Amino acid sequence: MNNNELIEKINKLRKEKNAIILAHYYQRPEIQDIADFIGDSLELSRIAQKSDADIIVFCGVRFMAETAKILNPTKKVLHPNPESGCPMADMATLEGVKKLKQEHPDAVVVSYINTNADVKTVSDVIVTSRNAVKVVKSLDAKKIIFVPDQFLGSYIARQVPEKEFILWKGFCPPHFNLSKETLLELKQRYPEAKIAVHPECNTDTVEIADFVGSTTQIIEYATTCDADTVIIGTEVGILHALKKKNPNKNYVFPQSADYCGTVHCCDMKKNTLDKVLEVLEKETNEIILPSEIIQKAVIPLERMLAVA
């Protein structure tokens, strides 16, 4: 089947089954185009919580689909490709976080939403890159265990210097591989350009940026700032949204040191139209979580949503 035929079948099935399709900005363009909602982790968490659909098809990596299930335990959440995982989320382990809690009993565990469900169960609050600083500032605790992204944690620590941070040594491989030198070379080629990066980038890269923010915040900044050219330091999938919002600007994506070339999350690209159709037809690849995990993991998620 060609894409038009796939899309026609997808649209028919989602109407028949009262299903919605959620897609992260890093998904393939054709996946973003069929989605009912496109967003970053925070936006999609809110939409998932408020949805009245019977079925949620989540086009993202696994922890995102798990989050949708945790917030909607009675709904059927389908993940088009179960091989679409997050290497950074897998870097944080349940036993490792428990050990840190024992070593620092006066600390609060703040987990990035990019964690697996079991780690969320031992977290005090969840954050996204968009609301992390606000949530951490709202906490009474003076000591923070931040899991799993050391670079986002370091960025938050610089914004909230009154708190002590214990950082898990995790990272996002595509963002980590984007070097300061690469951005500076692009700046020489485009001297009038602004640089916008994600806080998952390493500290040296973040420090030379004109703007640091979440995926949605980068899209807002890049499409509305006064520069005609913006160097984008995050996953190349957001180019689709950038062009839709403001096609008159020049968006430059740097080459990364990883094997994918640009800042490119190979896992995010594993969800395809044929896989979306397959899970809608067969209702396979359902996210199943034990009720105990859901009951524990929803607490820090709801704390986040209440604050931000």
From Swiss-Prot:
Binds 1 [4Fe-4S] cluster per subunit. The keyword Transferase applies. One of its GO terms (biological process) is 'de novo' NAD biosynthetic process from L-aspartate. It catalyses: iminosuccinate + dihydroxyacetone phosphate = quinolinate + phosphate + 2 H2O + H(+). Pathway: Cofactor biosynthesis; NAD(+) biosynthesis; quinolinate from iminoaspartate: step 1/1. Its main location: cytoplasm. GO terms for cellular component: cytosol. Iminosuccinate binds at H24, S41, Y112, I113, N114, S129, H198, P199, E200, T215. Catalyzes the condensation of iminoaspartate with dihydroxyacetone phosphate to form quinolinate. This is Quinolinate synthase. It comes from Sulfurihydrogenibium sp. (strain YO3AOP1). The gene is nadA.
